[in-house]
C-alpha cells in the first residue's frame, strides 16, 4: 500500500479533519463512499466490490475514503482533486450539491457521481431504473405472500426512494389486485441510511399489521429489516447487491442495481 493510500484511509473523524500526508501527486482513480461505510452490506459495499474487481482484473490501484459525517464531503473531494486523482467517483446522490460547486474548479478532472445527476462537462452521472427492478420484486412479493399484505421500508424520504416504493407497489398490484402494500420511510436525514435498529422497529410494525414479505431500500438500515424479518419467520427482499446469503431461506430475492458494474466501468 502506498504512503498516499495509507494517509487517505486514515482520514476519518471530524475532530481530526481531513488532511493528506506530504506525498507527491498521484493519478490513481479514487472512490469516496457515502455515509454508512464500505461494509454497509448494501449500496456502498456494492461500489467497493466493483472497485476491488477492477483492481484485481487490471492490476491497478485506487484511493478510497469513508466519511464519518456530511461536513467532510467538500474537504475529501477537494483533497482528491488537488492531489491528482482521476477519475474521482462518488457513491450516492448526496454528493450532488458539493460536486456542483467543485467540478468547475477542476475542469481537467473527471468526476463520476453514482445515483445522482450533476450537469457539468467534466461530470459523468450514473443513474438507474430502480422503479423497474422494484416493480419485478413487487410482483414476486405479492406472489409469495400468504397474508395478502406486503411491506416496503425506505431509507431517507426523498424522490429517489419514492421511485423504489412506487415501482414495488405497482408490481405487487399487477400480480394481485387485492394486495395491501404498507410503506414506511426511516427518516429525513442521511442518518436514515444507517439505522438498523429503526429499520427493525419499522419491520416489526409492518409484521404486526399483517405483512409477510418486506422489501428494504434503505442502505445499512436494511440490515435491521432483514434480520427482524428472519426472526419473525417472514420473507424479506434485499437491495443493491445480492443479500440472499445474509439470511438463507428468508431473503426471498434481491433487487440488484449493479452499482458494482457502474463503478468498474467508471474506473
Set out the residue ranges of the language-model regions.
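A residue-level marker of the well-folded mature domains of exported/periplasmic proteins
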Residues: 27-267
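Bacterial N-terminal signal peptides that target proteins for export
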Residues: 2-14
Amino acid at each position: 500500500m502506498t504512503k498516499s493510500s495509507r494517509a487517505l484511509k486514515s482520514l476519518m473523524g471530524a475532530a481530526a479533519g481531513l488532511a493528506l500526508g506530504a506525498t507527491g501527486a498521484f493519478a490513481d482513480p479514487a472512490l469516496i463512499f457515502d455515509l454508512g461505510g464500505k461494509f454497509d452490506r448494501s449500496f456502498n459495499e456494492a461500489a467497493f466490490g466493483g472497485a476491488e474487481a477492477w483492481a484485481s482484473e487490471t492490476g491497478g490501484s485506487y484511493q478510497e475514503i469513508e466519511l464519518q459525517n456530511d461536513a467532510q464531503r467538500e474537504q475529501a473531494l477537494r483533497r482528491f482533486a488537488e492531489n491528482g486523482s482521476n477519475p474521482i467517483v462518488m457513491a450516492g446522490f448526496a454528493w450532488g450539491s458539493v460536486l456542483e460547486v467543485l467540478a468547475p474548479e477542476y475542469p481537467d478532472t473527471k468526476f463520476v457521481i453514482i445515483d445522482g445527476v450533476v450537469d457539468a462537462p467534466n461530470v459523468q452521472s450514473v443513474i438507474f431504473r430502480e422503479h423497474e427492478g422494484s416493480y419485478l420484486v413487487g410482483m414476486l412479493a405479492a406472489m409469495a405472500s400468504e397474508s395478502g399484505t406486503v411491506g416496503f421500508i425506505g431509507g431517507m424520504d426523498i424522490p429517489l426512494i419514492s421511485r423504489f416504493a412506487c415501482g414495488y407497489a405497482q408490481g405487487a398490484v399487477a400480480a394481485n389486485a387485492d394486495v395491501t402494500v404498507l410503506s414506511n420511510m426511516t427518516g429525513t436525514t442521511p442518518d436514515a441510511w444507517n439505522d438498523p435498529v429503526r429499520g427493525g422497529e419499522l419491520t416489526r410494525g409492518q409484521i404486526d399489521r399483517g405483512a409477510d414479505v418486506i422489501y428494504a431500500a434503505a442502505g445499512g438500515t436494511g440490515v435491521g429489516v432483514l434480520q427482524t424479518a428472519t426472526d419473525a419467520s417472514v420473507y424479506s427482499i434485499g437491495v443493491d447487491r445480492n443479500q440472499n446469503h445474509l439470511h438463507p431461506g428468508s431473503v426471498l430475492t434481491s433487487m440488484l442495481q449493479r452499482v458494482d458494474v457502474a463503478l468498474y466501468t467508471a474506473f
